[in-house]
Each structure stands twice: as C-alpha cells, then as structure tokens.
C-alpha cells in the first residue's frame, strides 16, 4: 500500500502514453543504424587495437566501408563475407585493411546465409564471454552472502590518471563505498571514437578505455575480496560512442552505466536521431550484460527549477522506462534518475523533496532509482553543505532510493579529497543506520502537503505525456520541454553518422542478446 494515495488510473494512462511515444520513435530507430553501432559490431566481433596513426581499428573498418562500399548493408555483412573469402578472423581482416593490403568492398559476394554462418562461432563466443561476466558478478555476490540491502553508496573518482583513480577508488571502498564511478575526461562524449590503452592524463576525469576498465575492475575485485563485499564499477556510455562503451563495459564486467539519449541531446548537443538509435543497441547490450543503467533526469533540475519542472522529470522517467523495456532491459536494471535540487530557502522544501522521491519509488517499485545530491545550491559553506547532504540522505533511506550518489561537503569548491569522501560516507552511514526502518514506520497525512504535491506532479506529468504522444519525441525536444533546452532535429553532433539500413542489413548480436538466453 502506498503512502501517497496516487491515482493509479492516471499512472496507467501515463505509462500508456509513454509506451506510444517509445513505439513511435522505435519506427525510426529500427530503420536506421549509425557508425558507432557498426563499430560496436566490430568490437563484439573481436576487432580491437589501433592503426599506425593511432586510429582505432573499428573506426578504420567502418570509415573504409563508408568511403568505398555501401555502409547501409552493415559492417557484419562485409566482415562475414571477407571471412569466407580470405579464411581470416575479423581482427586479421581489420589489420590488413588498415595496412591497405585488403579491400573488403571489392570481393565477390556470398549468400547471406553463408555469411551469417561464417560469423556464428565468433558471435557466440563473445556472447558467452559476456554471460560468463554476468555469472562472475553473481558468484561474487553469492560468495559475499548476497547483495547489499538498502542504498548503494556511490562515489566518484576523477583524477585523469587511471592509476591514481585506483588509489582513490580502493580508499573509497575501504571507507564504505559500494559503487565507484570513474568520471570521463571533459568532452569525451563528443569524440566519435574510443581511445585505446591505459591513460594517465585527463581533464576533470579519466578517459573511458577498455584497458582502463580492466585495470579498475581488477583493483575493485581485489579490494572487494579483502573486504568481503562486491564493489560495483560504473562508467559513462552517453555521447557519440554509446553502444561501443556499453560493449567494452560488458566485456570487462562493469556493473553500471550512465545511459540516456535525452541527456546527450540536451546537455551535450548530440543529434537526437543519432543518439536514439545508439541508445537502443547500447541498452540491448546493458540489458544482456546485467548492467544497471542510470538515466539523467536529475540534470533537468540543474537548468530548470526543481519545483516548477518536477513533472518533466517524472514524464522523462516514464519515457526512459519504455525505451528500456523495448531494448529488453528489465525494471530491476533501470536506475531512473532524479535529484534533491530544490532551493534550500524553500518553505517546506524537505516535504516537497520527500514527496517527489516517494512518488518515484511508488510508481517504479522495482527500479534501483538513482538519486542525485544537492549541487546547484551548494555555496562552498561546508557546514551548511554537510547539513544539506544529511537531509538528502534522510530522503534516500526514508523512501528506499537505491543508487545513492553521495553528496560532498566540499561541492562547489574542488574535486573531493579522500578525506571529504570519508566524512560524507560517515554522514550517510550514520543516517542510514539510525533511520533504517523509519520509512516503514510512518504514514503520510491524507490531504497533507506531501500527498497533494505528489498528486499535482503526477497529474501534470500525465498531461505532458499526452501532449508528447501527439507531437512525438523529436518535436517535443525541439520545443524545449525538458530542462528548458531546445534542440533542432537536424542539428547537433553526429547526424552525418546516421544511415538508413538496406533491407538485407543485419546485426548478428541483436537476436542473440535481445531474444537470447540469459
């Protein structure tokens, strides 16, 4: 029984609208692919490394086909055909193309059935590797006596140097962190390639590379065994390489991925057609790999008012839920985002925050909701900041938020020191323990401030979803409904990388992962 007396008929209507919005966009998504989707297929076929100029081989292959062949047939068809012709593996084919020793666009075409058969061993071996990673995660959790009950304490490291990040991450795990997110270097989401190898320089974060993923995964596994807890690793697959980074994460057993097309469109000016197509394949991969995705609704409240625009967050959560379901990603892996971002001077602001968080929990009961700390109104006064974080911590434990992005008392001053993290973890653990069953023991007053507020937000969200259903997601974004940010349908970065699929196009991984045995 919910605390908020929500109108469940209205919730159902909102879900139906969101379902239609996603289905409408899916028509476009199903008819198109992008250069990064094709590069992801290359990576999943075992193509890795760089050419003599440092260009990733997946980029070399896809660019070669784009310039010399017909990309609308899809990269899998070219690679499979070349495997039959040359008797070589995809990696060897890519290396020869890079050295200009092979032209895969000028070969005699074989039958589609034979091409798919040629790819079968390698596609199945990749899928088995991802399944083994998923099992390894489950085995660790079992070894440590099951998953953590209550919120995951989620912290961020961002030094630019992966080896320094390891030092910070291991310290955070020992201090009590459950999830470590390695922030990406500034602007990586705008690169149309994924850098290669271990990196030691970054700005505001560290490069997301497969080798960096491997280094951090090993460090967290080692400290996890020492502590008897499974420490989750999180990275970011928004931006122009969404599905590629999802694939790298699946291959290296990451546990969480920031993954939201709307975030990329609004806050990174990535073309909407491009990133919605990319999001679909990235979510199929994340769903199959057992990765929890985190969505970016919290960011709307950094550019728009958290009280007036709360309904846009809920509407976006409904839409993100439907986009995830279409990609085969279960509710248990949907870290739908929201945030504690109301102006601290607001009268009864805490009640409004509590109502919003409780509403998300009741409407998405199985989702490991991602709850963001106050950032917009942190002033650099560390004492007040610590109290703002304490109120945020109270909302999390009271309403059962799951992915708890730890607030930092030094927010708005500098990137956290290890000591800042220790104090913030101590604050959260104190509150989570002291108020452990508080949420179960209280009821909300009928007709009170919180009940009224939640019903109001739900009503506005349902109305907004009805409007979006009529307009479609593309027009809605053009009008600036989310976060007050307008983006044109043919503007932004990456549109040149979108293409319509030929009717013989195939992506061998979609049937294996979307309909596949988990």
Curated annotation (Swiss-Prot):
Family: Belongs to the KamD family.
InterPro entries, sorted: Cbl-dep_enz_cat, Lys-AminoMut_A, Lys-AminoMut_asu_sf
Pfam families linked to this entry: Lys-AminoMut_A (PF09043)
Residue positions binding pyridoxal 5'-phosphate: 184-189, 238, 263, 268, 299
Keywords: Cobalamin, Cobalt, Isomerase, Pyridoxal phosphate
EC number(s) from the headed UniProt entry: 5.4.3.3
Superkingdom of the organism of origin: Bacteria
Catalytic activity reported: (3S)-3,6-diaminohexanoate = (3S,5S)-3,5-diaminohexanoate; D-lysine = (2R,5S)-2,5-diaminohexanoate
Identification of the protein by name: Lysine 5,6-aminomutase alpha subunit
Cofactors named for this entry: adenosylcob(III)alamin; pyridoxal 5'-phosphate
């Amino acid at each position: 029984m919910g605390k908020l007396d929500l109108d469940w008929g209205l919730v159902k209507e909102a879900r139906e609208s969101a379902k239609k919005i996603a289905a409408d966009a899916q028509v476009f998504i199903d008819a198109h692919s992008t250069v990064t989707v094709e590069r992801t297929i290359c990576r999943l076929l075992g193509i890795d490394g760089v050419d003599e100029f440092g260009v990733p081989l997946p980029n070399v292959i896809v660019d070669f086909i784009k310039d010399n062949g017909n990309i609308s047939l899809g990269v899998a068809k070219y690679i499979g055909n070349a495997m039959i012709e040359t008797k070589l593996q995809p990696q060897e084919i890519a290396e020869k193309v890079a050295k200009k020793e092979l032209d895969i666009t000028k070969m005699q075409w074989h039958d589609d059935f034979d091409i798919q058969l040629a790819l079968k061993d390698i596609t199945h071996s990749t899928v088995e590797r991802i399944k083994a990673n998923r099992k390894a995660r489950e085995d660790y959790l079992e070894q440590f006596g099951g998953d953590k009950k209550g919120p995951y304490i989620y912290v961020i490291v961002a030094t630019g140097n992966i080896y320094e990040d390891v030092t910070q991450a291991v310290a955070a795990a020992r201090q009590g962190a459950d999830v470590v997110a390695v922030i990406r270097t500034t602007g990586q989401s705008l690169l149309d390639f994924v850098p290669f190898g271990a990196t030691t320089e970054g700005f505001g974060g560290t490069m997301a590379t497969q080798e960096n993923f491997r280094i951090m995964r090993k460090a967290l596994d080692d400290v996890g065994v020492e502590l008897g807890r499974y420490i989750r690793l999180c990275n970011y697959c928004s931006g122009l390489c969404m599905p590629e980074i999802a694939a790298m994460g699946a291959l290296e057993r990451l546990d969480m991925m920031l993954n939201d097309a709307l975030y990329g469109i609004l806050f990174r000016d990535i073309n909407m057609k491009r990133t919605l197509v990319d999001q679909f394949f990235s979510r199929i991969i994340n769903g199959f790999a057992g990765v929890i995705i985190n969505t970016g609704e919290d960011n709307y409240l950094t550019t728009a008012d958290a009280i007036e625009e709360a309904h846009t967050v809920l509407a976006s959560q409904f839409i993100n839920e439907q986009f995830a379901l279409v990609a085969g990603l279960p509710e248990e892996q949907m870290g739908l985002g929201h945030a504690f971002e109301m102006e601290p001077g607001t009268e009864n602001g805490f009640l409004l925050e509590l109502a919003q968080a409780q509403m998300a929990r009741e409407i998405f009961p199985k989702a490991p909701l991602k709850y963001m700390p106050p950032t917009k109104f942190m002033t650099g006064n560390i004492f007040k900041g610590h109290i703002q974080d304490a109120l945020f911590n109270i909302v999390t434990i009271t309403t059962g938020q799951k992915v708890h992005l730890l607030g930092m008392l030094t927010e708005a001053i500098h990137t956290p020191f290890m000591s800042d993290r220790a104090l913030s973890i101590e604050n959260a653990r104190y509150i989570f323990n002291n108020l452990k069953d508080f949420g179960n023991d209280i009821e909300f007053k009928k007709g009170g401030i919180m009940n009224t507020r939640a019903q109001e937000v739900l009503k506005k969200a349902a109305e907004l979803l009805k409007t979006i259903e009529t307009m479609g997601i593309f027009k809605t974004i053009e009008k600036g409904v989310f976060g007050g940010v307008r983006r044109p349908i043919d503007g932004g970065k990456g549109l040149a990388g979108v293409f319509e699929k030929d009717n013989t196009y195939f992506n061998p991984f979609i049937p294996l992962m979307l309909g596949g045995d988990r």
